[in-house]
Amino acid sequence: MRAVIVAVGVAFLVSLFCTPIAIKVFTRLKAGQPIRAEGPVMHQGKKGTPTMGGVVFILATVIAYVAGHLALTTLPDAQIAQVEPTITALVLLGLMVFSGAVGFIDDFLKVRKRHSGGLNKRGKLLGQILVGAVFGVIALYFPSTMTDSQGTLTNTETVGSTTLSFIRDIPALELTKVGAVVLFIFVVMAATNGVNLTDGLDGLATGASVMVLAAYALIAFWQYRHWCADPNYTQEYCYAVRDPLEVALIAGAAAGACVGFLWWNTSPARIFMGDTGALGLGGLIAGMAMSTRTILLLPIIGGLFVIITMSVVIQIISFRTTGKRVFRMSPLQHHFELAGWSEVNIVVRFWIIAGIGVAIALGLFYSEFLARVG
């Protein structure tokens, strides 16, 4: 627990104090956000606001992970915990960094061309598929070799699973390894695009991501305290996962980094996370769902992202089939802007929706545990 607290604190402070430096640097480099002409008129005042701020909280998360491990070295946890970095950390941080890199290319092209159109859809899609495939393979093909003090193998789990999961793996829904990789690619694409579509108002995606990541930190730490690698817990209710403390540490660090960034990203935003941050967060959230065996729980935890994504899908289908639009504009937050809601009202109300989704998901997770314990 101490390592997680250290990681959260370090991530928050690094993000809080480095974001204003990034604002100055990106302003000097004229790395301002282009605004699409067909967007809400009130957004034209945001033109030129520094973008690519996701670089800050991605770096803050990586730095905090290292700090958390240093804390784990000097203040060992009473339970089973691997002090050295793990494949799990490689997968989760890799998903965040390389998904963020795809977004960075998109942001860079937007800034360079002074136009809201950056990386084309095919290029972004290929980038997401490549990242999902590479880390999906790593997650499935490298089992843990964790041993106890006597050298006995205590954990052989992989980061991901070939079984579809809700709160745990569902044995009846077994996939092949190829099928599991394809599923994970889909989850990466869905999560990255969900966060990206939500990132349309000051602080909206950042605040929602804080809640989702905090939820995953709680889930992973609970799994760590009831881990099948610990002989004190029975197979009836323990969690068959790999390196849950690592997952909790990274989720907590990312949540802390986002809180620090939110100080500067809240309305009126001094900096935007850009596709760098949105895709980075989406990639990490997808990894969290995979590593905690909660893939089918993700649509509830990230309920706001799902609602906003579905508003775009509904708008497209309606327009192509009937020639009519269901919403004044999509994604959904812009519909309410054009309906006269203030930006702050929309953001706070959407945060409430995000919080409700997180609360329901955590309730389901804990209820399942209680049902097993009896």
From Swiss-Prot:
Keywords: Cell cycle, Cell division, Cell membrane, Cell shape, Cell wall biogenesis/degradation, Magnesium, Membrane, Metal-binding, Peptidoglycan synthesis, Transferase, Transmembrane, Transmembrane helix. InterPro entries: Glycosyl_transferase_4, PNAcMuramoyl-5peptid_Trfase, PNAcMuramoyl-5peptid_Trfase_CS. GO terms for biological process: cell division; cell wall organization; peptidoglycan biosynthetic process; regulation of cell shape. CDD domains: GT_MraY (cd06852). One of its GO terms (cellular component) is plasma membrane. Disulfide bonds: none annotated. This is Phospho-N-acetylmuramoyl-pentapeptide-transferase. It comes from Salinispora tropica (strain ATCC BAA-916 / DSM 44818 / JCM 13857 / NBRC 105044 / CNB-440).
